Amino acid sequence: MTGLEHGPLMRRALELAERGGGRTAPNPMVGCVLVTSDGTVIGEGYHRQAGGPHAEVVALEAARAGGHDPAGATAVVTLEPCDAHNRTPPCTVALLEAGVAEVVYALSDPHIGKGGAERLRAGGVLVTGGVLEAEARRLLEPWLHFVTTGRPHFHVKTAQTLNGRVTRGREGEPWITGPEARRLVHRLRRRSAAVMVGSGTVLADDPLLTVRDWPPQEEAEEWPEVQPVRVVLDTRLRTPLDARLVVTAGVLPLWILAGEDAPAERERELAGRGAEVIRVATGRTGLDLAAVADELARREITGLLVEAGPTLATALLEAGLVDRWTMLLAPDWVTRKGALPVLLTDAPYVGFELVEPEWSIHGPDAAVTGQVRRAG
């Protein structure tokens, strides 16, 4: 195969990889396409969940199940095949035993000594790396951050008006953004190991924090149903017992991170309804966010979407814990008293910039996302 032919196949592998979002942590999302020398796709697969078979193995099994011999085929995979025996055997062994002739991958394994490119080459396999590397790096950004820093990747999402208001200042007002932009939020939830809000958002909006509007209806049968862990930062355990998050805690995971001195009786009441209350240290104004990050890392949450109100967004930004920010922008201008700004801070200056921003249009709304770099 020529390098020009690898791009579309790698793009398909990336599409497959995303289907595993929300279930693979602490492993990455990985997709694989097996193709013959004449360009016929004989097998596809993706890593569905931690502890399960890796994408390459799934694709090999799919090829054999379809009556195809993978010997001599090319494996197009989003991440360099692993050469380490952890929860599953090395993918290099499966590929070599299958007689695959060529392996094309997007991104090198960041774990020193665990990538399998050299072993594959030693076994006579033609290996090419770096195909659509930027796209793969973008998809795997939370996982890469986790394995290189040991801390979960915090992706903050806000919805705001043109003048930076996240509420309209009056109860019962409609959503800031329309259904197309909200569908993007559901896609981001679907990719994430966890979704986080503060107690203020729970009290104001009574969110459910589930994935409902993704994938598209016509693709629904091809995607496994996935719901992220729902996380609430609630120093004093103010979350109501009849909140939708609590009512559904028996069937969907809910972690409530509370201060060490939060009421024990309230913890028992919440636990009785299925929520898990996790005690963490407190700081000057609430939970110690570094301790929160450490606890989530201990629980192998590689990345989370933070649907932040002004208080939580400000606290995370000031703590240096915002890695990516997605802003949904509605074509409205709201000056009503009580309409809250994106950030609430007494600091004389809080600035940041979005690195390599990506803009998109969703119905009447716009979205911009980028990695966060503190300015000033």
Predicted regions and their residues:
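Active-site beta-strand termini and strand-to-loop segments that position acidic
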Residues: T36-S37, T148-T149, Q371-R373
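Proteins enriched for Cys/Gly/acidic motifs involved in redox and nucleic-acid/cofactor modification
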Residues: R23-P26, G51-G52, A117, L126, ...
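Enzymes that bind and transform nitrogen-containing heteroaromatic metabolites
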Residues: T2-P28, G43-E44, H153-H155, Q160-G376
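Short capping loops/turns at secondary-structure boundaries
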Residues: A84, T88, G129-L132, V147-R151, ...
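Helix-turn-helix
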Residues: G31
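Generic structural signal for helix capping and beta-alpha/helix-loop junctions
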Residues: I112-G113, R137, A313, V334
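Zn2+-dependent cytidine deaminase-like catalytic core
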Residues: L34-E135, W255
